[in-house]
Amino acid sequence: EGYEFGGVVGTHMTNLAFEEKCKMQSIPFARANVGDRYVSEELDRRKWLIGGENSGHILVKNLHSTGDGIISALQVLSYLVKNKKSLKNALTEIQLYPQILINIPTENKVNLKSKTVKNAIMESEIIMKGKGRILIRASGTQPLVRVMTEGPLRKEALTAAKFLTEKIKEII
């Protein structure tokens, strides 16, 4: 009750190209922590209808409150039918950026706000020529540090991810 389209909620792992596509179409975009629960909470906080995450879970608050795969598939099919599009054509509407994800196993808690990590991020932003996004986070479910880089230039994103990984391994 009281929800409106308003905008779209993704997660910290949602591809930057999707966020940019939303902005180009004047659709507000917000990021939540990874997980349906956090997407749902952000939707509730903003009173927005639509959110989702990379797993394919799509939440539409006026229809359902969970990221059910069958419901998500039916929603995609409904969109295709209403807009008279093939799945192939719909998928060409957005060109996602290459996204590099490296998982670093660790039994130790890593200070991701350390000067070493901050400097490595700054150097990685230079490697990526200021284009793209860098995310370093501890896994919520496994003993891992996740390093994610993405941007229009795959080579730079890969180089930056490898560089960050080496710097983090130095402080583990």
Question: What is each model feature region?
Answer:
Residues 3-172:
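Phosphate-binding and adjacent anionic-ligand microenvironments
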